[in-house]
């Protein structure tokens, strides 16, 4: 009788183990590239989760030794507002000025500059080194705002 109970208990444990091992992954969201700007050096990304959509920009890094810079923008309404603020700031910014931008608990550093006569921000992600930045041009910002307003993305 004892042997029967042990066999029954082992078979019960073995029948439950496969269920437990397959229950470890749960889809929590998806990320898609919505559109590329500035010949692909800036990508508008959309992350879809249970809490809603979050937009971000992927900026090509100045240094080939570092990963791209990911700039979070927030949900659609917040993203458009932030982009409009960036555009207005670039109109009035002066050489050498820098700004802190905080979104979703992360603080980015924006440094105003000009590259080949084009106004731009050099953007450092949190905890990055001095050569680890991406560029975001005013023209690109305005194109992204137009895209949001025209396509209702």
What function would you assign to each model-found segment?
Residues 1-26:
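Bacterial Sec-dependent N-terminal signal peptides
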Residues 21-153:
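Positively charged, low-complexity terminal tracts
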């Amino acid at each position: 009788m004892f042997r029967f109970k042990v066999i029954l208990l082992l078979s019960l444990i073995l029948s439950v183990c496969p269920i437990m091992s397959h229950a470890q992954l749960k889809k929590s969201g998806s990320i898609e590239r919505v559109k590329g700007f500035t010949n692909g050096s800036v990508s508008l990304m959309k992350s879809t989760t249970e809490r809603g959509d979050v937009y971000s920009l992927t900026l090509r890094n100045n240094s080939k030794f570092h990963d791209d810079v990911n700039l979070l923008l927030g949900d659609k309404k917040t993203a458009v507002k932030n982009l409009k603020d960036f555009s207005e700031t670039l109109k009035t910014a002066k050489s050498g000025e820098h700004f802190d931008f905080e979104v979703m608990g992360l603080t980015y550093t924006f440094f105003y500059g000009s590259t080949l006569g084009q106004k731009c921000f050099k953007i450092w992600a949190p905890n990055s080194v001095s050569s680890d930045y991406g560029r975001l041009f005013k023209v690109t910002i305005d194109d992204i705002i137009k895209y949001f307003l025209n396509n209702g993305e």
